[in-house]
Amino acid sequence: MTKYKFILSGGGTGGHIYPAIAIANELKLQFPDAEFLFVGAKDKMEMQKVPQAGYEIKGLWIAGLQRKLTLQNMMFPLKLASSLLESKRIIKKFKPNVVIGTGGFASGPLLQAAGSAGIPTVVQEQNSFPGITNKLLSKKANAICVAYENLERFFPKEKIVLTGNPVRQDLIDIDTKRDEAIAFYGLDPNKKTLLVLGGSLGARRINQLIEKELQNFLSQDVQIIWQCGKLYFEDYKKYNQQNVKVVDFIERMDFVYAAADVIISRAGASSVSELCIVGKPVIFIPSPNVAEDHQTKNAQAIVEAKGAILLKESELDNEFSIVFEALLKDDGKQKQLSANIKKLARPDATKVIVEQIKKLL
C-alpha cells in the first residue's frame, strides 16, 4: 500500500485550526500509515494547538496586512517572500501528495508554493464570504470545499464542492455527556446554564455585555460558563465564582456544549457549523469587524431557517435583556430553535472533504 504524505495549513484562530485537525484525523483513520505535517504562522496559537493534537508543525514568518500603515505592513512583502521560500523548502523536503489549506496567514504562501510545484491543492473555505487569500489560491486549487451555496461569484464553479465545515467528532451525541460535563465544571444540575463564547481570542463587546448583565443572570437563577478569551482574561477573572465559571480558552468543547441550555456566540463559520451539530438554542452576536460583514451573513442563514436569534452589537443595550429573558422563559421556543438549527447540520462534512482529497491521490 502506498504511504501517502499530507501537508495541512490552518491557523490564527480556532476556526481555522480545528477544521485542519479534523481533516488530518479523518485522513489518519483512512490511511493509518500516512505522514502528516502542519505549517502555521510563528507565534500564533496553531504552534501550541497542533502539537497538542499529536501532529508536527513548522512555523512561517508571516502575518496579515493591517488596515492602516504600520511597521508590520511595511514588513509584509519581506515576510511574504521569506515564507514563500521556506514553503518551497518544506515542500521539496517533505514531498507531499496533497496540500490542504483551511485559512490563516500561512496557508497563502504554502498553497502558492505547492501549486507552483505541481502538487495538488485543496482549499477549504469556511465562510459565506471568502477572504482575499482563498480567492487568489482558488485559481490554482484542484478543489474548493465550501460550506455555503452561491460562492460561484468568488471561485471557479467547476472546482466548488459543497461539503459543509469539518467539526470535531466529539461534538456528535453530546447529550450523553451532560452529567459528566456538569460535574466537570462543578455546576448545579438543577439550574439553567448559559454558555458564552467569544471565539478563541475573545470578543470585547460580548464581555462588556456579560459584565453588565451578570447580576441579572444570577437573579434569574442562571449559572454561566463564560469564555472571555485570552486577550481579556486578566480583566474578567475577578468575576469567577460558584455560579460563574470564567475561562480564557476551552479545551473540552464537548463538555461546555453538553452542559449548556442556552448559548451566546459570535458567528464565525466554524462556530456556526459546530452549533448546528450541537443543536442548542443560540443567540448570535456577530462581529462587525470582519471582511464584508461575513459573520452577520453566516448567522442570517440560520435565522432564516428559524434556527437561531440574531442581535447586532448596536442592538444589545436596548434589546438583549428582553430577548434573553423571553427565551429563558419559553421552553417551546427553545425546543423550536434546537430542532431547526439541527436540521442544518452536516455531521459528515469531514468525510466528504477527505473523499475529495482522495480523488487527487
Curated annotation (Swiss-Prot):
MF (Gene Ontology): UDP-N-acetyl-D-glucosamine:N-acetylmuramoyl-L-alanyl-D-glutamyl-meso-2,6-diaminopimelyl-D-alanyl-D-alanine-diphosphoundecaprenol 4-beta-N-acetylglucosaminlytransferase activity; undecaprenyldiphospho-muramoylpentapeptide beta-N-acetylglucosaminyltransferase activity
Entry's localization field: Cell inner membrane
Catalytic activity annotation: di-trans,octa-cis-undecaprenyl diphospho-N-acetyl-alpha-D-muramoyl-L-alanyl-D-glutamyl-meso-2,6-diaminopimeloyl-D-alanyl-D-alanine + UDP-N-acetyl-alpha-D-glucosamine = di-trans,octa-cis-undecaprenyl diphospho-[N-acetyl-alpha-D-glucosaminyl-(1->4)]-N-acetyl-alpha-D-muramoyl-L-alanyl-D-glutamyl-meso-2,6-diaminopimeloyl-D-alanyl-D-alanine + UDP + H(+)
Alphabetic keyword roster: Cell cycle, Cell division, Cell inner membrane, Cell membrane, Cell shape, Cell wall biogenesis/degradation, Glycosyltransferase, Membrane, Peptidoglycan synthesis, Transferase
This enzyme's EC code(s): 2.4.1.227
Cellular component annotations (GO), alphabetically ordered: plasma membrane
One Pfam assignment: Glyco_transf_28
Pathway annotation from the record: Cell wall biogenesis; peptidoglycan biosynthesis
Topological category with respect to the lipid bilayer: Peripheral membrane protein
Binding residues for UDP-N-acetyl-alpha-D-glucosamine: T13, G14, G15, N127, R168, S200, I250, Q295
Main EC class the enzyme belongs to: transferase
CDD domains assigned to the protein according to its UniProt record, in alphabetical order: GT28_MurG
GO biological process terms held by the UniProt record: carbohydrate metabolic process; cell division; cell wall organization; lipid glycosylation; peptidoglycan biosynthetic process; regulation of cell shape
Protein family (similarity comment): Belongs to the glycosyltransferase 28 family. MurG subfamily.
Function: Cell wall formation. Catalyzes the transfer of a GlcNAc subunit on undecaprenyl-pyrophosphoryl-MurNAc-pentapeptide (lipid intermediate I) to form undecaprenyl-pyrophosphoryl-MurNAc-(pentapeptide)GlcNAc (lipid intermediate II).
Name listed for the protein in its UniProt record: UDP-N-acetylglucosamine--N-acetylmuramyl-(pentapeptide) pyrophosphoryl-undecaprenol N-acetylglucosamine transferase
Gene: murG
